[in-house]
């Protein structure tokens, strides 16, 4: 039974929303950007979502469900709701009741995650979701830590778990010149993931500087100042490289 009433309210910290999004999962989607992230990516376009509280609003799950139900007629057969951030798994426990209700209402769920948080709540969250968008920042462990200040070990273990339980996922890779746009690292990633059956597609995300102004507003240094955005030739070369290992590759 699809009803927006919850027996127990777990407030969720929401940073912002995007209606009719087309870049975060299949079809038209309501994208819910959640507050809080455990990574410190040098290129982060949403630095205002990192702090657990920030300028977010404590939101009742009913509010998000009602918004999803209002937009459901536009989702069609492929669309739905994507939870992004920030890092959604920071609030896994709070999200589980909402995920259950969304599924009862026949709404497709994506989770856009760095895969570095893994516990029983996250397992349940991923099990309920229809599709995981797994952000692999870098395959090389040293360069991953330089780029995010965190290890990529759990991200890779999470991918192994998704494969083992038969959960479909997409792999997303931000192509940062000099940091992740490195041929040997992409080939290592390809050799590692090339045989994964649950990996449905690879998305190359071009590096951009659209969030740089937020750093200035927050009084923070943007540490990739001077790094130029990808040229069309660089994106074509990267796609050709990924194509050697994966059957379905897109530049998003």
Kindly give the residue locations of the regions a language model identified.
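Auxiliary Fe-S-binding modules of radical SAM enzymes
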Residues: 2-26, 177-252
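Conserved alpha-helical substructure of the radical SAM core
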Residues: 7, 47-81
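Canonical Radical SAM [4Fe-4S] cluster-binding loop centered on the CxxxCxxC motif
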Residues: 16-18, 22-59
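Short glycine-enriched, charge-decorated loop/helix-capping segments at active-site entrances
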Residues: 48-54, 145-151, 219-227
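Conserved AdoMet/S-adenosylmethionine-binding subsite of the radical SAM
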Residues: 69-73, 77-80, 85, 89-210, ...
């Amino acid at each position: 039974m699809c009803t927006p009433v919850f027996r127990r309210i777990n407030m969720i910290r929401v940073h912002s929303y995007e209606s009719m999004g087309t870049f975060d999962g299949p079809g038209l989607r309501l994208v819910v950007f959640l507050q809080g992230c455990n990574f410190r990516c040098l290129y982060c376009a949403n630095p205002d979502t990192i702090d657990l509280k920030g300028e977010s609003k404590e939101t009742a799950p009913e509010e998000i469900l009602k918004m999803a139900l209002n937009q459901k007629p536009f989702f069609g057969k492929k669309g739905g709701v994507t939870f992004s951030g920030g890092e959604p798994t920071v609030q896994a426990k709070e999200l589980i009741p909402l995920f259950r209700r969304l599924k009862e209402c026949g709404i497709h769920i994506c989770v856009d995650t760095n895969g570095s948080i893994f516990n029983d709540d996250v397992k349940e969250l991923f099990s309920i979701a229809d599709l995981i968008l797994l952000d692999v920042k870098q395959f090389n462990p040293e360069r991953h830590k330089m780029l995010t200040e965190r290890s990529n070990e759990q991200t890779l273990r999470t991918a192994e778990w998704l494969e083992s339980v038969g959960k479909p996922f997409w792999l997303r890779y931000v192509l940062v010149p000099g940091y992740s746009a490195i041929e040997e690292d992409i080939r290592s990633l390809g050799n590692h993931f090339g045989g994964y059956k649950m990996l449905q597609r690879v998305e190359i995300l071009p590096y951009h500087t659209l969030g740089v102004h937020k750093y200035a507003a927050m009084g923070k240094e943007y540490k990739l100042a001077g790094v130029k955005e990808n040229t069309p030739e660089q994106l074509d070369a990267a796609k050709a490289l990924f194509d050697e290992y994966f059957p379905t590759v897109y530049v998003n």
